[in-house]
Amino acid sequence: MVCSVALSKGKSVLDAIDLQDGMNHAALLAPTIERLLQSNSVKPSDLDAIAVCSGPGSYTGLRVGSATAKAMAYSLGKPLIAIPTLQALAQAAFDLHPEAEYALPMIDARRREV
């Protein structure tokens, strides 16, 4: 499983951290967010919004991410933006290959299925 935290401005990703540490996402997410912000000299109050993937994805992972994002958005008074996982993957494909006409995003269901 992958847990990702990114900082973006406009359409550009300024920095990102991807964790591939098994099932420790709940314990690692908040410190990873803090590390990402500190390494970019950004305070939480500087953020304009908080975005989170809304699925599909791991049930527990989505719950941890959603709860963390919702708590941050609420405590900072910032908007919370839910982004469907497959929509984000399709957009990334088009960003990398602007000549493409179609994209078919898929994720590993961890059961030898997509």
Predicted regions and their residues:
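Nucleotide and nucleotide-moiety/phosphate-recognizing core
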Residues: 3-114
